[in-house]
C-alpha cells in the first residue's frame, strides 16, 4: 500500500489524500488496470472504501481509495463540506493523476463507490469517458435520498424546508467562526429511526468502524446543493459504460440502485442482489463484502 497526495485542477486549490492498494507481485515496470474507490458520505479512505480497495487488490487488481475534498486527510475548508459537484469532480481528479503513472494503463480505468460514493461515481462516469467500467455498492443518489427519504416515502416539495435550513445556515456561518452542521448518520443510537440506520450509528460511532477523521456530520450549508442534485442526471443518455450494481435485498436504499439500473443507457448492465444484506451490511460484514467483491472483481477483470 502506498500513500500519495494528488494535486487537483478543480479550481479549489485542494490536494487529495489517497492510498494505492497493490496486488501481490506488483511490478512497477508493467502496466495494470486500476479501480478508483469512492467512500460513503461522511466516510474516509480507511473505512469501507479502503476495505474494498484492499480486497480488490487481493483479487489481483490495482485499486485506489481517497478522501474527498474538505474531508479526511484531504485539504480544503470549510471542513466536512459535502458539495456533490466537487465530490464527483474528485473522482475525475484522481483519474487525472492516474493517467500520469507509468504503471497504470490509462485505457483500463474503472471506478466504484459505496453509498453516496456510488452515486458520485455514476455521475463521474456520465461526465468522464476515461472511466471505462462502473461498479456500485449500496448506491445512494444523495439528492434523491435527502429529497425523498431513506425509503422513497417523501415528496420532492416537502424537502423545501431543507433548502430553507441550508440557506439560513449560510447566513449563520457568515456571522460565526463555528459552522452549522447536521448528521450524515445518527449521532446517537437513540436518534436512529430504524435498525438499518442504527447500524449506521454503530458503524461511524463505535469501535465497529469509527475513525477520528470521520466525525459523521456535514456542513448544513451543503443542503441547498444536495437537495437539487441528481447523481444520475442524463444517465439515460450518457451512462453507456458497463455497469455492475450490488445491493442487499433488505436495504432500505435499494430503490436507488433500482433507479440507476433503470436509467443507465448501458447495454451491459446488471444488478447482483445479496440475500439478507441491508445497506450497512455491505460496508464491512465479511460474508456480504466478500460476495460483493467477488462479483465486482470478476466484473472489472472482464471489462477492463
Task: Locate the predicted segments by residue.
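N-terminal cap/lid segment of alpha/beta-hydrolase-fold proteins
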Residues: 1-30
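The serine-hydrolase catalytic nucleophile loop
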Residues: 42-54, 68, 257
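Alpha/beta-hydrolase active-site loop
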Residues: 48, 81-102
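Conserved alpha/beta-hydrolase
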Residues: 55-75
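Alpha/beta-hydrolase fold nucleophile elbow
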Residues: 102-115
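Alpha/beta-hydrolase-fold enzymes
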Residues: 122-203
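Short beta-strand/loop motif that positions the catalytic acidic residue
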Residues: 238-239, 245-247
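Catalytic histidine-centered segment of alpha/beta-hydrolase-like enzymes
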Residues: 277-290
Amino acid at each position: 500500500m502506498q500513500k500519495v497526495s494528488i494535486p487537483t485542477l478543480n479550481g479549489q486549490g485542494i490536494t487529495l489524500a489517497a492510498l494505492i492498494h497493490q496486488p501481490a507481485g506488483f511490478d512497477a515496470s508493467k502496466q495494470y488496470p486500476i479501480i478508483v474507490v469512492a467512500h460513503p458520505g461522511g466516510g474516509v479512505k480507511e473505512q469501507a472504501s479502503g476495505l474494498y480497495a484492499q480486497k480488490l487488490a487481493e483479487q489481483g487488481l490495482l485499486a485506489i481509495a481517497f478522501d474527498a475534498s474538505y474531508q479526511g486527510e484531504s485539504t480544503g475548508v470549510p471542513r466536512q463540506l459535502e458539495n456533490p459537484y466537487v465530490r464527483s469532480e474528485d473522482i475525475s481528479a484522481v483519474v487525472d493523476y492516474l493517467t500520469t503513472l507509468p504503471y497504470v494503463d490509462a485505457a483500463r480505468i474503472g471506478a466504484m463507490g459505496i453509498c453516496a460514493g456510488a452515486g458520485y461515481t455514476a455521475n463521474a462516469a456520465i461526465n468522464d469517458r476515461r472511466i471505462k467500467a462502473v461498479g456500485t455498492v449500496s448506491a445512494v443518489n444523495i439528492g434523491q435520498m435527502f429529497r425523498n427519504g431513506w425509503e422513497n416515502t417523501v415528496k420532492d416539495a416537502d424537502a423545501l424546508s431543507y433548502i430553507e435550513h441550508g440557506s439560513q445556515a449560510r447566513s449563520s456561518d457568515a456571522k460565526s467562526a463555528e459552522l452549522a452542521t447536521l448528521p450524515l448518520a445518527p449521532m446517537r443510537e437513540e436518534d436512529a429511526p430504524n435498525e438499518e440506520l442504527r447500524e449506521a450509528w454503530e458503524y461511524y460511532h463505535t469501535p465497529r468502524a469509527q475513525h477520528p477523521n470521520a466525525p459523521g456530520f456535514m456542513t448544513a450549508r451543503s443542503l441547498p446543493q444536495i437537495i437539487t442534485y441528481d447523481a444520475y442526471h442524463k444517465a439515460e443518455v450518457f451512462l453507456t459504460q458497463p455497469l455492475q450494481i450490488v445491493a442487499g435485498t433488505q436495504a432500505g436504499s435499494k430503490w436507488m440502485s433500482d433507479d440507476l439500473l433503470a436509467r443507465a443507457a448501458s447495454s451491459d448492465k446488471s444488478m447482483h442482489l445479496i440475500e439478507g444484506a441491508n445497506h450497512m451490511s455491505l460496508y464491512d460484514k465479511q460474508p456480504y463484502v466478500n460476495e460483493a467483491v467477488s462479483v465486482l472483481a470478476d466484473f472489472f477483470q472482464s471489462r477492463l
